[in-house]
Amino acid sequence: MANDPRNFPQRKLLVTCALPYANGSIHLGHMLEHIQADIWVRYQRLRGNIVNFICADDAHGTPIMLKAQQMGMSPEEMIAAVSIEHQKDFAGFDISFDNYHSTHSDENRELASHIYLQLKKNGFISSRTISQLFDPEKEMFLPDRFVKGTCPKCKSEDQYGDNCDACGETYSPTELINPKSAVSGATPVMKDSEHFFFDLPQFESMLKEWTRSGSLQTETANKMQEWFESGLQQWDISRDAPYFGFEIPGEKDKFFYVWLDAPIGYMGSFKNLCDKRDDLDFDEYWNKDSKTELYHFIGKDIVYFHSLFWPAMLDGSGFRKPNNVFVHGYVTVNGAKMSKSKGTFVKASTYLEHLDPECLRYYYAAKLNSRIDDLDLNLEDFTQRVNADVVNKIVNLASRNAGFIAKRFEGKLAENFVEPELYNEFVAAADRIAELYEAREFGRAIRELTALADKANQYVDEKAPWVVAKQEGKDQELQEICSVGINLFRVLMTYLKPVMPALAARTEAFLNEELTWEGVAQPLTAHEITAFKALFNRIDPKNIEAMIEASKEDAAAEMAAKEKAEASNAAQETELSKDPIAEEIEFDDFAKVDLRIAKIVSCESVPKADKLLKFQLDIGGEMRQVFSGIKAAYNPEDLVGKYTVVVANLKPRKMKFGMSEGMILAAGPGGKDLWILEPHEGAQPGMRVM
């Protein structure tokens, strides 16, 4: 075998998946990336390489802060619960992480601060006052993802404030056309704030050289070239309080933008792993001159951050850059975007309740390649392909031979292997399949494997052991035929081991032999296997239907819970909580205010004044002219003849439209929501309000 790992030096790899955001459940879209990365990692381990496979929850940002408030818990409590759920889902799909951590950790805080201070020391951080979108209703600066509007470049509507899903462009939220707050729906206003910036343009030549290295996917390199031609911009790395994240060292009420500390979470998770193990050295993997290999698996929606900002941050702070960033497309279901109403937005946990995770691992592998293509999970094709390939072609190869070995030969394979040429053809395929695994061309590797399975089954069909078993004096021939079939199955399962580790483990128990890449070089002879048990079950379409229905129920329950939480929060948000009581005053201060009952004698709109009404008030033998900003709440004619309360001893104020000689009392937040105070029947003009 030319690709025998014993012929190559052992590689040391650090592999990561993009960090799932800690405000929701893992779904089948997430699983594409994690399955893709896990297959590659398992292949590398199978070849004898040292792999550290890490991930973490991305646990910072305004969305997490707001959702925690909605759920009535602290952000720390929420992200802890989400982390448990995420790790359970990944374990259910046999994702073989060496460590799973959180960006809200001591390791990440220390590393984020260190990298920032190094960048600042090296002249890559600057600050300036910017005009930023501010929600006037919620009284908070709006993070990028909480502003929506029309993309300034391609004009696609309903796009987030940091980047466009349609064209991939990144921009400032202030550049959006017709922006709206995603928190309240209000039109944001501009407000000044000091922000801190990472000087990305200083790294343009380095990034261009990195792009020309030839290792990046063609689509990624082409996209980066577009960004270079458009001109790199300084990157805003700060956010204002209130914000859930890490405070910027030396600054008050200023926090790191989530996209600064999120990729540093790769380092934080690895640092956490190093602290648990004596055989790992953090610096060996992250020093600028590291000889180890670093790979990131990500989705196409976050290429900009990983191919520009991240390598520039690392380079500017004295750390190594990734060897490569492997980008994949999105998952669609039945040719369309995943839909909660149709039940095709399937959570990982819902899938695991109804179907074998190995089925999805196989199907994704069968359709994955090294390009940035979207992958369609066609549920009918999913059923047919898994049943046809895994059950009918591969597992059936074992079942149709194992019975004869167990019953007629006490589980022992033949001493002589009678089909060396056929077996060598299977062994020779190892080099080609290895190249395809290494290149992440999993679909092509699966096609090579199933083509071999067809040849193996053709051999069994031609030799017909069920016929030979009925012929006297043919025991040795029967044993030899079935032993060939079992050995070909062993080779196939070795090649399939990175894709279907649970099936491979059951196969190893059946064969009484570990499946190793170098082990396929020689067939098993005179070897005892165990009694055959069903290794894999067919997909029942009814289980898929049940999964879809359960997903619809999940979506409905999620919506109901959200509405309940919103209603609860609305009920808790009292007028007093929205507008707290002012600072205490002494009684003598209050006694200075002279409140009197007044009768509205006349009321009219003030020309060229949007908010004002002009009143003539009788306060008990004396007439007063008063202007009041309640025009949006009342028609002037409706107020004539009513009684109200007025501050009678307020110093007259000269206004553009005349002198105002008092103040009418009204309650409410403003605008249309204002109500003048009216006394009970019996109160007369001039009476003092006690």
Swiss-Prot record:
Record SUPFAM superfamilies: Anticodon-binding domain of a subclass of class I aminoacyl-tRNA synthetases (SSF47323), Methionyl-tRNA synthetase (MetRS), Zn-domain (SSF57770), Nucleic acid-binding proteins (SSF50249), Nucleotidylyl transferase (SSF52374)
Motif ('HIGH' region): 20-30
InterPro entries per record: aa-tRNA-synth_I_CS, Anticodon_Met, Met-tRNA-synth_bsu_C, Met-tRNA_ligase_1, Met-tRNA_synth, Methionyl/Leucyl_tRNA_Synth, MetRS_core, MetRS_Zn
Cellular component GO terms, alphabetical: cytosol
Span(s) of short sequence motif 'KMSKS' region: 337-341
One annotated GO biological process: methionyl-tRNA aminoacylation
Molecular-function annotations in GO: ATP binding; metal ion binding; methionine-tRNA ligase activity; tRNA binding
Location (main, coarse): cytoplasm
Subcellular location: Cytoplasm
Gene3D superfamilies for the chain: HUPs, Isoleucyl-tRNA Synthetase, Domain 1, Methionyl-tRNA synthetase, Zn-domain, Nucleic acid-binding proteins
Residue stretches making up the tRNA-binding domain: 589-690
Enzyme's top EC category: ligase
E.C. numbers: 6.1.1.10
Residues that hold Zn(2+) according to the record: 151, 154, 164, 167
Binding-site list for ATP: 340
Task performed by this protein: Is required not only for elongation of protein synthesis but also for the initiation of all mRNA translation through initiator tRNA(fMet) aminoacylation.
HAMAP family: Met_tRNA_synth_type1 (MF_00098)
Protein name: Methionine--tRNA ligase
Gene: metG
